[in-house]
Swiss-Prot record:
It comes from Mus musculus. The chain crosses the membrane at residues 241-265, 274-292, 308-329, 477-497. Gene3D superfamilies: Neurotransmitter-gated ion-channel ligand-binding domain (2.70.170.10), Neurotransmitter-gated ion-channel transmembrane domain (1.20.58.390). Pfam families: Neur_chan_LBD (PF02931), Neur_chan_memb (PF02932). It is a multi-pass membrane protein. The keyword Membrane applies. The lineage of its organism: Eukaryota, Metazoa, Chordata, Craniata, Vertebrata. Residues 23-240 are extracellular. One of its GO terms (biological process) is regulation of membrane potential. The keyword Signal applies. Disulfide bonds join 150-164. Keywords: Cell membrane, Disulfide bond, Glycoprotein, Ion channel, Ion transport, Ligand-gated ion channel, Membrane, Postsynaptic cell membrane, Receptor, Signal, Synapse, Transmembrane, Transmembrane helix, Transport. Pentamer of two alpha chains, and one each of the beta, delta, and gamma (in immature muscle) or epsilon (in mature muscle) chains. Glycans are attached at residues 52, 163. This is Acetylcholine receptor subunit gamma.
């Protein structure tokens, strides 16, 4: 068993010796390179030399976009490359060592920071090691979580898209000292934010449409002075509106539909209509408050969803007003309001035909004229004797006794009057009875009084029914008007969002797509 362990021990000792020798070579190389090395000095052999620094941004996660704070949070890797002539070596002198890992704090860095941060964190999250090659070129890939400012346009919220950017520049060096440029691959500048499909995490609220990158020169610097270069990485992102459609827009549309459906309640149920409409109005106010907590507090624009909720509130208020007006019309009576001929013709003849509503046909003109005379208390044309109603107020026993005597006559008279005789026939019939005995004349007076009271009550009920029919027709007209307004307003507002799309190209007038060429 000891003989079987010897080969393993020899291999282990050989690996330790080789590792120690390789480590010793790295230590020796690092010591040689760091001898008289000052990380605070720019790696330029002459003062007029410019150090080229290339940048590449790799996006691994678009964490969030806070609309109220107007802050974009991203998880990125910043790839920076530059050359330092003081870190060159010959691999032959160090047993073929081609890569040296050096702590980033020990070498010169171009001080690239995020200019438009919102939390005061300008630098990267981890100062990882840099990779140094024999020609002195340095490769540094630090990770970072940045919170950058992003101006939010709330005009089409939640069907909006935003143009956010990450602006990088050197904190201490100008264009006469370093030259910022985009990294190149196969001779082509990487003018876009690189996304590794295997490492990238999709955001649930935002979809990336364009991700170009551009070099900009600080325009605020005087002409005689050197300005600062900026590398700007743009993110054109479009919101996924499904969350807001399901949780805000769809409930609002359904609740507002309930407000429209109150027109199917009877015209006299104005109190119930106002109660339902008021509850809908309160629910819409709650949704408007929820939207106000989401968007930035700005007066530059009104969000599309706020416009829609305000529109729904206006429609609901109009429904309440309509309900009050219809209730006022439905409760009118002939004693308080006289219906004009134009109102009767419009609401009881023309509009019901147009709306295909079933309305009871109007009474003949002669009966209408008789109702008019009854309403005004006129007895001309009716053979009623000049007897006060108080003369008929006899004791109950006497009335019952007389009633039994003239039961047949009264019944015949009532049948004549209830069967709706012609006015002329009624006059002839009652005129023939005037020559009868005083008892019959008293019976005629009583019958005429009862008939007049019944006709007046019938006319009163008919007048109430007419006003109720006017209320029904007006209610139907308001229903069609509010339904049309609701449908047209909803379609018009959301069609505005349909035409708010991300442009096909990231920069207007620039035909380049700022994307890698297809293979």
């Amino acid at each position: 068993m000891q003989g079987g362990q010897r080969p393993h021990l020899l291999l282990l000792l050989l690996a330790v010796c080789l590792g120690a020798q390789s480590r010793n070579q790295e230590e020796r190389l690092l010591a040689d390179l760091m001898r008289n090395y000052d990380p605070h000095l720019r790696p330029a052999e002459r003062d007029s030399d410019v150090v080229n620094v290339s940048l590449k941004l790799t996006l691994t996660n678009l964490i969030s976009l806070n609309e109220r704070e107007e802050a974009l949070t991203t998880n990125v890797w910043i790839e920076m490359q530059w050359c330092d002539y003081r870190l060159r070596w010959d691999p032959k002198d160090y047993e073929g060592l081609w890569i040296l890992r050096v702590p980033s704090t020990m070498v010169w860095r171009p001080d690239i920071v995020l200019e438009n941060n919102v939390d005061g964190v300008f630098e990267v999250a981890l100062y990882c090691n840099v990779l140094v090659s024999p020609d002195g070129c340095i490769y540094w890939l630090p990770p970072a979580i940045f919170r950058s400012s992003c101006s939010i346009s709330v005009t089409y919220f939640p069907f909006d898209w935003q143009n956010c950017s990450l602006i990088f520049q050197s904190q201490t060096y100008s264009t006469s000292e370093i030259n910022l440029q985009l990294s190149q691959e196969d001779g082509q500048a990487i003018e876009w934010i690189f996304i590794d499909p295997e490492a990238f995490t999709e955001n649930g609220e935002w979809a990336i449409r364009h991700r170009p990158a551009k070099m900009l020169l600080d325009s605020v610097a005087p002409a005689e002075e050197a300005g600062h270069q900026k590398v700007v990485f743009y993110l054109l992102i479009q919101r996924k509106p499904l969350f807001y459609v399901i949780n805000i827009i769809a409930p609002c549309v359904l609740i507002s539909s309930v407000a429209i459906l109150i027109y199917f309640l009877p015209a006299k149920a104005g109190g119930q209509k106002c109660t339902v409409a008021t509850n809908v109005l309160l629910a819409q106010t709650v949704f408007l408050f929820l939207v106000a907590k989401k968007v930035p507090e700005t007066s530059q624009a009104v969000p599309l969803i706020s416009k829609y909720l305000t529109f729904l509130m206006v429609v609901t208020i109009l429904i309440v007003v309509n309900s009050v007006v219809v209730l006022n019309v439905s409760l009118r009576s002939p004693h308080t309001h006289s219906m004009a001929r134009g109102v009767r013709k419009l609401f009881l003849r023309l509009l019901p035909q147009l709306l295909r509503m079933h309305v009871r046909p109007l009474a003949p003109a002669a009966v209408q004229d008789a109702r008019f005379r009854l309403q005004n208390g006129s007895s001309s044309g009716w053979p009623i004797m000049a007897r006060e109603e108080g003369d008929l107020c006899l004791p109950r026993s006497e009335l019952l006794f007389r009633q039994r005597q003239r039961n047949g006559l009264v019944q015949a008279v009532l049948e004549k009057l209830e069967n709706g005789p012609e006015v002329r026939q009624s006059q002839e019939f009652c005129g023939s009875l005037k020559q009868a005995s005083p008892a019959i004349q008293a019976c005629v007076d009583a019958c005429n009084l009862m008939a007049r009271a019944r006709r007046q009550q019938s006319h009163f009920d008919s007048g109430n029914e007419e006003w109720l029919l006017v209320g029904r027709v007006l209610d139907r007209v308001c229903f069609l008007a509010m339904l049309s307004l609701f449908i047209c307003g909803t379609a018009g507002i959301f069609l505005m969002a349909h035409y708010n799309q991300v442009p096909d190209l990231p920069f207007p007038g620039d035909p380049r797509p700022y994307l890698p060429l297809p293979d």
